A protein has these predicted regions:
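Carbohydrate-active catalytic/glycan-binding domains of CAZyme proteins
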Residues: 1-320
Length: 320
């Protein structure tokens, strides 16, 4: 069963904060495409993107979305970043692209959800709600009401990625929360997120109702607390491996820049959030930063490899 891993790279040049792709035949060993160069390069907004998400729509086409943000372009001469300014004076748009075949992409679009009080919109992710036949985009944001002090998870609904409902609060805690990942398995919704304090780490909650009460997973919290530098993991994404095991990827940034990227955890059964770290079972050509893994067909896998491998000197796309 092949997989596509959409992600960005942490570099000191803007070409890292663009859309990069990798593929895998087995879900464990990933190969970069396009010579490890971007497949899509932003030409609007902040001229870069982070927190890449991709979903296969009902019509079998694809939508990519990402945070409209280029950290490199906001660094000072010493490579320092003012995160308080970025979270209170950031972009109020997300970036969006469409694709029918994962090798050709529409031009970048900036999508606005209609709220001027947001200080930023980070880590957007698409979840298909089959009960309402809606695509839900949930994302992290700060708001003016508390002087942009606490991040929470908001959501908007769409059916066509052109028209969006007014964003509402989806999930919050006493401290800030961000980097939400939402998946439904066997009738249970699983929400992964990261807290900003007390404690600073990734969390997991479950619910039988998407907009109902969430049950905190203390076993998951205790395991996360046992990790080396637990506060240096973020950006959860999950997928089911061909053998039925559940893979959780967490983006680790508690090291030098060239070693930053996703580290894998496995549970023996999809929906059972008792994970253990298994770095030795996976291989990556470089550090993959905040992204998304989806299943693709054998034909799509071969087409991606053939297209990009046969494009000598292929430049990342700004538009078809």
């Amino acid at each position: 069963m092949p997989y596509l891993f959409a992600h960005f790279r942490e570099k000191l040049t803007p070409d890292g904060e663009q859309i990069h792709l990798a593929v895998s035949k087995n879900g464990y060993d990933f190969t970069a495409v396009n010579g490890s160069k971007p497949v899509i390069t932003c030409d609007k907004g902040e001229m870069g993107c982070r927190d890449i998400d991709v979903i296969r729509l009902k019509d079998n086409s694809f939508v990519f979305i990402a945070t409209d943000l280029c950290i490199v372009n906001r660094m000072d001469e010493n490579h320092n970043v003012n995160w308080a300014d970025i979270s209170s004076n950031g972009s109020k748009f997300i970036s969006l692209w469409r694709s029918d075949d994962l090798v050709h992409f529409t031009p970048q679009e900036l999508k606005y959800f209609g709220r001027d009080d947001f200080g930023c919109i980070w880590a957007p992710e698409i979840f298909y709600d089959e009960t309402a036949d809606d695509y839900i985009i949930h994302f992290s944001a700060t708001v003016k009401a508390d002087n942009f002090q606490k991040m929470a998870i908001y959501y908007t609904k769409t059916k066509d990625f052109e028209n969006f409902t007014y964003p509402k609060l989806f999930f919050e805690k006493e401290c800030g929360v961000f980097d939400s990942h939402l998946v439904k398995i066997d009738g249970t919704y699983h929400l992964f997120y990261k807290t900003s304090a007390k404690p600073l780490m990734n969390m997991h909650e479950t619910s039988k109702d998407l907009f109902g009460t969430w049950q905190h997973d203390f076993d998951f919290q205790n395991y996360m607390a046992s990790l080396y530098r637990p506060g240096s993991h973020e950006a959860a994404t999950t997928y089911i491996l061909p053998d039925g095991k559940w893979c959780l990827m967490l983006d680790f940034f508690g090291c030098e820049k060239e070693k930053m990227g996703y580290v894998p955890f496995i549970s023996e059964k999809a929906g059972d959030a008792h994970f253990h770290q298994v770095n030795q079972l996976f291989s990556f050509p470089y550090g993959f930063k905040h992204g998304k893994v989806i299943e693709i067909s054998d034909e799509e896998y071969e087409k991606i490899l053939s297209f990009f491998n046969n494009k000598a000197g292929y430049a990342s796309l700004r538009a078809d």
